[in-house]
Amino acid sequence: MPPLDRADPGPDAVLNDETRYWRENGYLKLPNFFPHEVLDAYVEDCVAQGIAPHGWSDPCPFTHQPLMRDIACYRPLMDKIEMLIGTPMGLNLALTGWRSTTRTWHQDDYLNPPYINCHYAAVWIALEDIDPDCGMFEFVPGSHKWPLTRGAKIQSLLPSETRFEPDWPVQAEKIITGLLDRKIEESGIPIKSFQARKGDALIWHGRLAHRGSIPKNKELERRSLIAHYSAIVKRKDLPRLKRHRDQGWYFLLENSKED
């Protein structure tokens, strides 16, 4: 596990106000973190390409979208994530739609190979001021300390004919949601929303319970970029890496389209 997830983080762990907060709560807000001109260039490019508001269907469009990498591989962001996880990280997934995912309660790490073991983080980046009626990102502080339901355990609860299908995570959503609904109710921990302004970001732990809430106004866009990162030394299944200029690293999947 990452040093900050251990009972004793050890002598090499960075302990400051931010890492202590992360250790306790499982997330870290970064107010006004991104230069607006970098965000604007990406937004304008999305509109020009006709990608907005649905986003790319490709889960790794960053391999061929340098303006997205300017944001998701932004060096100060990569440095923050490395500080929290304790090892260099690489970008491995991006969700690019400008509507709420409406994905119900889940933890990210159950979808990872078990050897990742929390060496994982994700970031919610606001490309504009976010209207609270658009379906906000919600999370449960401290839920990263709850026991993780491993993917193999969830798969074992699925019918044998769907257990190993590529879309098994979709089939498992009802199970995961039910487990976390009960846990949240039992814990009594208040649910928090990330009401972000343009340039704000929120980093969250791979085990933090979170969801994309149902929008009150489905016509509203939620202009954001959601990026996921894995420890470079842990991703034995993703051996190809590339660096974005002098910024951060990103993984190349087999048959990745490149710019």
What is each model feature region?
Residues M1-A7, D17, K153-L157, K198-I203, ...:
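Non-heme Fe(II)/2-oxoglutarate
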Residues D133-A209:
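Double-stranded beta-helix
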